[in-house]
A protein has these predicted regions:
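Short beta-strand elements
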Residues: 182, 596, 752-764, 805-813
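Surface-exposed amphipathic alpha-helical segments in non-transmembrane regions
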Residues: 702-704, 710, 745-750, 784, ...
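C-terminal structured "cap/appendage" subdomains that terminate the fold
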Residues: 747-784, 790-794
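Short beta-strand micro-motifs in enzyme catalytic cores
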Residues: 5-7, 197, 723-725, 773-775
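Accessory, non-ATPase domains that flank or precede helicase/AAA+ motor cores in DNA-metabolism machines
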Residues: 1-442, 454-470, 780, 788-792, ...
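Short secondary-structure junctions
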Residues: 15, 590-593, 748-757, 801-806
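Inter-lobe coupling/hinge segments of SF2-like helicase ATPases
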Residues: 275-295, 301-738, 754, 765-767, ...
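A short, contiguous, amphipathic alpha-helix enriched in charged residues
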Residues: 35-36, 736-749
């Protein structure tokens, strides 16, 4: 049979259960322009609804009347490379998401279209006859009447509004099949490309000078011409601003052929570096030794992976800088990932000083327009070094040679929404595709990463000492049980109070860490014990002193606090101090001493992380109180004291990673102290001072912690000695959720058998969130294709089976909670 050109297309509307590359005919006008990586509009499903799609591959196939044609090409050039297309398909298989979910993670939000579906009355439609053919079907008549009432063109959302709670899809499908209605799609870009107009002379210089003499009665036109005669070419807006001339004067000169206007792409950017790049500082002998080893891996013909363990303040960033310079010299690009948005300003400032305008920044805190334009600069090869948070791992860097993940143990590198990917896994795939070097850096490496280094899967490098032989902070463990026995029930121990007093006397700065925002975690009645709980979630409401509101940090529900208990009228007690309460306590303990609070609420008021950090550094504010965002990467030379206010908070949470998270948090925040010339100190407040993890963190002895933790993991069969695969079920009815979970558990036990330990159903730590109950079945196994296929099959089955229609099911690889 006749072979025709076809395209394999990932379709936006496809759910996970039906997601696959769909085959579409390529119309003759598109055969020369359509390529993989271009977006298209295609008819999809029974109603041929216009839908956006991405071309994954081109092929030939036998002509089949059932094949639908592509209706429109949206991109004149591919917006996605073949490597990133392969990445999207791999993510579909690896993270249990649709291909389009992966594409939405890979591409910036500004590149997407808003696609609207419009139903139109067919040309020459006999409305009366069509309504008669609708018969007794009220839905068909309503759909047709709604389209006619809108003048024969009605957007789908208007039709859905007319139908209320009912779905108009079946009625619309029938009307389209009967050729009473046609379907159209409209597209509008979320962010448009910005163009800048430039003005230049359209005539020779001598002729322009003659025009100046002839136009003495038009002073604004003369001013424009004189400026262009001097500088040759400039932004049209700046020319008008500099000369004071209105746009009408510029327009008149253009219409008369004296001035020419052309346009160039303009990049909206978060950071502009105008100075000359500085030389990178010289490495110490220890850093030089590490750099030499990593440089050899960078030059290797195949993909390589390495773990760099360096204590806080050992100068890992300087090694990164030299490695990136080496990659650039070889004509390669580089990506540096940081765990928090708060770290990007410091990194960007440092990297721009050494690499100039070739540095781009990507993170979710940027406006859509700036993210989109930074992505365009990277794709065009104008930016070869990318610094950003988790999503920057998808940056379309040309000739990627180096990908660095700083503080690689951080949970923020794992996405908790679809697609549920870990940046480290994506980085491994990309480095394999580019034959690049993946470098993981940390003062407290992930236990799994350290095990891979020990067993030879990663190369291993160490920086065991601080830069310039600076000492690690001296650490004191404060026993909060003893403080209670001594009559101190406050959040600041006598030990920490004395150290803060000493720092204030010296004019040095202090940082206090508490991973709980708000003022009080629980508000309870001293008489009857009633507590304020969220009506939508199974958690207590947190009291915020600034606005005197009780707020749920999961769903956003808020309400005013009552003057007394609403149940019995008793006195209310505020328990479980947060950052707001600590700030108030500090003002009471040290009257007149300025403090700065850095948590999500304070940042929302200040506008950006950067504004608060700059204020802390510039004004030398004596004390900063903050949540997890202050624990890593920040470098303030005048900070000589760190206080960890509740070291037990993350230690007893029933997760196999609890010890690791606690050790990492304490070690990282202690490392903010003593990074300048003055020695550092730290105070760890705990109710369990004999706990081995806390004592190891106080000694900052990662090797001892790793040895004890890996023994425990091996005994329990937890990662790295297995992998975790979780299938989560959520729904409004708890019994329906548990019933579905039980079915999934039984399915795994029958299909996988001895290859996995199957646990559950078990409630999540917050079992009800936004009025939906959440339970989980967990597998501890060595993941194989068969295990993953079984997980994908059960997710697809449960999301399409009518008996489970009231629940939502998804799978997650190594979940955080």
């Amino acid at each position: 049979m006749l072979q025709i050109p076809v395209a394999k297309v990932a379709v936006l509307a496809a759910t996970f259960a039906f997601d696959r590359p769909y085959t579409y005919k390529i119309p003759q006008p598109l055969t020369d322009t359509l390529r993989p990586g271009c977006r298209v509009m295609v008819p999809f499903s029974r109603g041929n609804r216009p839908c956006e799609g991405m071309v994954l591959a081109l092929d030939k196939a036998e002509d089949d009347p059932k094949l639908k044609p592509i209706t429109r090409q949206l991109d004149p050039e591919p917006i996605l490379s073949l490597e990133l297309i392969r990445l999207a398909v791999w993510m579909h298989d690896r993270f249990f998401c649709t291909i389009y979910d992966a594409l939405h993670a890979i591409l910036p939000a500004g590149v997407w279209y808003r696609v609207s579906t419009v139903y139109c009355a067919a040309p020459e439609l006999d409305a009366a006859a069509a309504l008669a053919q609708c018969g007794r079907s009220k839905q068909r008549r309503l759909a047709l009447e709604t389209v006619l009432e809108h003048g024969g063109r009605c957007p789908l959302d208007e039709l859905q509004a007319a139908f209320g709670d009912k779905d108009p899809a079946s009625a619309l499908h029938w009307l389209v099949e009967q050729k009473f209605l046609t379907v159209e799609g409209t597209q509008k870009r979320v962010v448009r490309d910005k163009q800048l107009e430039y003005a230049s002379l359209a005539v020779p210089l001598e002729e322009a000078q003659e025009e100046i003499r002839r136009r003495r009665r038009a002073p604004h036109q003369v001013a424009i011409l004189e400026l262009l005669c001097t500088i040759g070419r400039a932004s049209a807006g700046e020319v008008c601003q500099f000369t004071g001339a209105p746009r009408s004067s510029m327009k008149a000169l253009v219409q008369q052929g004296v001035v020419h206007i052309d346009t160039e792409p303009y990049f909206r950017r978060p950071v502009h570096y105008t100075g000359q790049p500085q030389p990178i500082p010289v490495l110490t002998p220890a850093q030089e030794q590490v750099f030499d080893g990593l440089k050899e891996l960078l030059r290797a013909p195949d993909a390589q992976a390495a773990l760099l363990f360096g204590v806080t303040g050992s100068g890992k960033t300087l090694v990164y800088l030299h490695l990136i310079a080496q990659a650039l010299a070889a004509g390669q690009g580089a990506i540096l990932l940081v765990p928090e948005i708060s770290l990007t300003p410091q990194m960007i400032e440092a990297f721009s000083a050494y690499f100039g305008d070739t540095v781009a920044v990507l993170h979710s805190g940027l406006p859509l327009s700036e993210r989109y334009d930074e992505w365009k600069r990277i794709r065009a090869g104008l930016a070869r070094v990318v610094v950003g948070t988790r999503s920057a791992v998808f940056a379309p860097v040309q000739d990627l040679g180096l990908l660095i993940i700083d503080e690689e143990q951080e949970d923020t590198y794992k996405s908790e929404s679809t697609p549920r990917y870990h940046a480290r896994d994506v980085a491994k795939f990309r480095c394999a595709q580019h034959r690049a070097l993946l470098l993981l850096g940390s003062a407290t490496p992930d236990v799994v990463s350290r095990y891979y280094a020990e067993t030879g899967r990663y190369h291993y490098f160490t920086l065991p000492d601080r830069f310039n032989a600076r000492k690690l902070p001296d650490v004191i463990i404060a026993d909060m049980k003893q403080e209670l026995r001594n009559g101190n029930s406050g959040s600041i121990s006598s030990v920490l109070y004395g150290e803060l007093e000493e720092n204030l006397r010296r004019g040095e700065q202090s940082i206090l860490f508490l991973n709980r925002r708000g003022a009080s975690k629980i508000v309870t009645c001293a008489e009857c014990g009633a507590t304020y709980s969220c009506p939508n979630c199974s958690v207590s409401l947190t009291y915020h002193q600034g606005n005197q509101m009780l707020i749920c940090h999961h769903c956003g529900y808020r309400r005013r606090v009552d003057p007394q208990c609403p149940v019995c009228g008793g006195e209310l007690r505020f328990l479980g101090d947060g950052t707001e309460r600590i700030e108030a306590d500090l003002h009471a303990l040290f009257p007149g001493v300025e403090t700065l609070r850095m948590d999500a609420d304070a940042i929302a008021m200040a506008g950006t992380h950067e504004a608060l950090l700059q204020r802390f550094a510039r004004e030398r504010i004596p004390i900063m109180i903050g949540t997890q965002m202050i624990t890593k990467g920040l470098n303030f030379e005048n900070v000589t004291l760190v206080g960890v206010l509740n070291a037990d908070q993350s230690l007893y949470v029933g997760d196999y990673r609890a010890n690791e998270r606690t050790f990492s948090l304490i070690t990282q925040v202690i490392g903010r102290s003593g990074r300048g010339d003055a020695p550092g100190r730290a105070v760890i407040q705990t109710f369990t001072p004999a706990n081995e993890t806390i004592r190891q963190a106080a000694r900052q002895d990662y090797d001892a912690f790793y040895r004890s933790e890996i023994r425990l993991r091996k005994l329990n069969g937890t990662p790295p000695f297995s992998e975790v695969l979780a299938v989560t079920v959520s729904g409004a009815q708890e019994n329906a959720v548990v019933r579905c979970c039980a079915y999934i558990r039984d399915y795994f036990r029958q299909t996988i058998g001895e290859r996995a330990e199957v646990l559950g159903p078990a409630p999540l730590p917050v079992v009800r969130m936004n009025n939906r109950y959440r339970y989980r079945v967990t597998l501890y196994c060595n993941q194989s294709k068969a295990v993953r296929r079984a997980a994908a099959n059960i997710v697809m089955y449960c999301n399409t089976e009518k008996s489970f229609r009231d629940v939502t099911v998804f799978a997650d690889d190594n979940p955080l909670d």
